[in-house]
């Protein structure tokens, strides 16, 4: 192993590597979400015919995983480094292994395994062929080829690579607790995040107002529907994300029964599907601007026929 990179050096290294592969370096999307996949930079851009290559860090909130800052590996909020490439390069796995080498991890010196783990997100109507990537026995990455997003079949296929930054940093820095990770020289992860972890856990499990959350879910759902009636995809999707996070808070609080849980997930999924269809329709009206001229002309001609 080379010099132990800090957390922010890991991010900078990955950004530089994927920038070299032609990815847009996006910024984290400013609405709560449970995974980088739910960012519009992945969810929306994975559907339709236009090419899209992007990489970004996404803070991901999972209220039920909060442990008051007492568990060394389970967190209310963790960070993912998300890469999406569409169409998927034929050498995407080789590129991924090369990215690990940039981080000082030589694939020839470590046990790196791709373990089949097909992916599904019921609340957004999304699924794909997938693998977990295990490094010396620890999962550090999820690899997915999207087959369906928002209930729509994908084409061309999008490849998604999701690095778990805390796990990766724990491995590189050889620490047992995420709170001991060096975020930057002289500053530990715990000095930044242990207090928010405690407070968000306490809020999620003990303090949140269930009646308010239930009311908000319905309001967010109706507002998403209103936005969709006006063809406003991005505001509508923001409210879908708010529905999802509100549901996760309700779930963490134990305010949703098993039967109700399925109903809430179905309501979010129905909205996500309409968002996906509307997004593709709106991009088509614009003439799919990210396509090259020849492909665009051919595609629009086929649709006209």
Swiss-Prot record:
It comes from the Bacteria. Pfam families: tRNA-synt_2e (PF02091). Keywords: Aminoacyl-tRNA synthetase, ATP-binding, Cytoplasm, Ligase, Nucleotide-binding, Protein biosynthesis. It catalyses: tRNA(Gly) + glycine + ATP = glycyl-tRNA(Gly) + AMP + diphosphate. SUPFAM superfamilies: Class II aaRS and biotin synthetases. One of its GO terms (cellular component) is cytosol. InterPro entries: aa-tRNA-synth_II/BPL/LPL, Gly-tRNA-synth_heterodimer, Gly-tRNA_ligase_asu. Its main location: cytoplasm. The keyword Cytoplasm applies. Its EC number is 6.1.1.14. One of its GO terms (molecular function) is transferase activity. It is found in: Cytoplasm. One of its GO terms (biological process) is glycyl-tRNA aminoacylation. Belongs to the class-II aminoacyl-tRNA synthetase family. HAMAP family: Gly_tRNA_synth_alpha (MF_00254). PANTHER family: GLYCINE--TRNA LIGASE, CHLOROPLASTIC_MITOCHONDRIAL 2, GLYCYL-TRNA SYNTHETASE. Tetramer of two alpha and two beta subunits. This is Glycine--tRNA ligase alpha subunit. It comes from Streptococcus suis (strain 98HAH33). The gene is glyQ.
């Amino acid at each position: 192993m080379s010099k132990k990179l800090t957390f922010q050096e890991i991010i900078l290294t990955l950004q530089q590597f994927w920038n070299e592969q032609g990815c847009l370096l996006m910024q984290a999307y400013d609405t709560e979400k449970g995974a980088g996949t739910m960012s519009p930079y992945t969810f929306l851009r994975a559907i339709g015919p236009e090419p899209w290559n992007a990489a970004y860090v996404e803070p991901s909130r999972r209220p039920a995983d909060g442990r008051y800052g007492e568990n060394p590996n389970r967190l209310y909020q963790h960070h993912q480094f998300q890469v999406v490439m569409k169409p998927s390069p034929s050498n995407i796995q080789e590129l991924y292994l090369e990215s690990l080498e940039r981080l000082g991890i030589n694939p020839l010196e470590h046990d790196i395994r791709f373990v089949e783990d097909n992916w599904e997100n019921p609340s957004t109507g999304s699924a794909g062929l997938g693998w977990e990537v295990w490094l010396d026995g620890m999962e550090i990455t999820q690899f997915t080829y999207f087959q369906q997003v928002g209930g729509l079949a994908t084409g061309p296929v999008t490849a998604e690579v999701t690095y778990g930054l805390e796990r990766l940093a724990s491995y590189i820095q050889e620490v047992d607790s995420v709170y001991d990770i060096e975020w930057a020289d002289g500053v530990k992860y715990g000095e930044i995040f242990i207090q928010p972890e405690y407070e968000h856990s306490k809020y999620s499990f003990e303090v949140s107002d269930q009646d308010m959350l239930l009311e908000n879910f319905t309001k967010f759902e109706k507002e998403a529907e209103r936005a969709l009636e006006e063809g406003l995809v991005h505001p509508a999707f923001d409210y879908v994300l708010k529905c999802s996070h509100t549901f996760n808070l309700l779930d963490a609080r134990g305010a949703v029964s098993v039967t109700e849980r399925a109903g809430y997930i179905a309501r979010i999924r129905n909205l996500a599907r309409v968002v996906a269809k509307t997004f593709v329709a709106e991009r088509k009206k614009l003439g799919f601007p990210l396509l090259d001229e020849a492909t665009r002309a051919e595609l629009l001609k086929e649709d006209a026929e």
